[in-house]
Swiss-Prot record:
Top-rank lineage group of the source organism: Bacteria
Function: Responsible for the release of ribosomes from messenger RNA at the termination of protein biosynthesis. May increase the efficiency of translation by recycling ribosomes from one round of translation to another.
Pfam families: RRF
Protein name: Ribosome-recycling factor
Species: Bacillus cereus (strain G9842)
Main location: cytoplasm
Organism placement in taxonomy: Bacteria, Bacillati, Bacillota, Bacilli, Bacillales
GO cellular component, one term: cytoplasm
InterPro entries for the chain: Ribosome_recyc_fac, Ribosome_recyc_fac_dom, RRF_sf
Compartments in which it is found: Cytoplasm
Family according to the record: Belongs to the RRF family.
């Protein structure tokens, strides 16, 4: 029983770190990345559709994103959706493709982005700690029910703490790398 709680906690912590990584992908670091458009939904024939399903997105240069719609009639809708998504990007449309030039980040904007990264990191750590708390609560319930011994409880609690420390260190490492990427000129 205790092993199941341990396994479940481990999986949930892994998911929390993966969600954090996905969240960080949307924080742009001065370099063009198609992941900034992941959450952009285009109103395509009345249905909200992700832009990645409507167009080929390429990064020909470090600060340029080119969006080539499969259906040329959707180019205006894609452009509107990008503007509406409020990503701080200015798409330019030449009739066949949409180009998005990423401006160089100012020092102030870089610092703001680092703050955002730290905020996301703290949220991810809280999520990992919440999983630890839930796992420990489940273990205490098992001990009260007599399904595991007090010694087992202590051992499993230590195991969950080790996993928690491992995942928090992983979050810190991801955050440190992203901060370094943002502050790179």
């Amino acid at each position: 029983m205790g092993q199941q709680v341990l396994k479940s906690s481990n999986e949930k912590m892994e998911k929390a770190v993966a969600a954090y990584s996905r969240e960080l992908a949307t924080v742009r670091a001065g370099r063009a990345s198609s992941s900034v458009l992941d959450k952009v939904q285009v109103d395509y024939y009345g249905a909200p559709t992700p832009v990645v399903q409507l167009a080929n997105i390429t990064v020909p240069e470090a600060r340029l994103l080119v969006i080539q719609p499969y259906d040329k009639t959707s180019i205006g809708d894609i452009e509107k959706a990008i503007l509406k998504a409020d990503l701080g990007l200015n798409p330019s449309n030449d009739g066949t493709v949409i180009r998005i030039a990423f401006p160089a980040l100012t020092e102030e904007r870089r610092r703001d982005l680092v703050k955002v990264v730290k905020k996301y990191a703290e949220e991810a750590k809280v999520a990992v700690r919440n999983v630890r708390r839930d796992g420990n609560d489940d273990l205490k319930k098992l001990e009260k029910a007599g399904e595991i011994t007090e010694d087992d409880l202590r051992g499993y609690t230590e195991d969950i703490q080790k996993e928690t420390d491992k995942y928090i260190a992983k979050v810190d490492e991801i955050a440190k790398n992203k901060e370094k990427e943002i502050m790179e000129v």
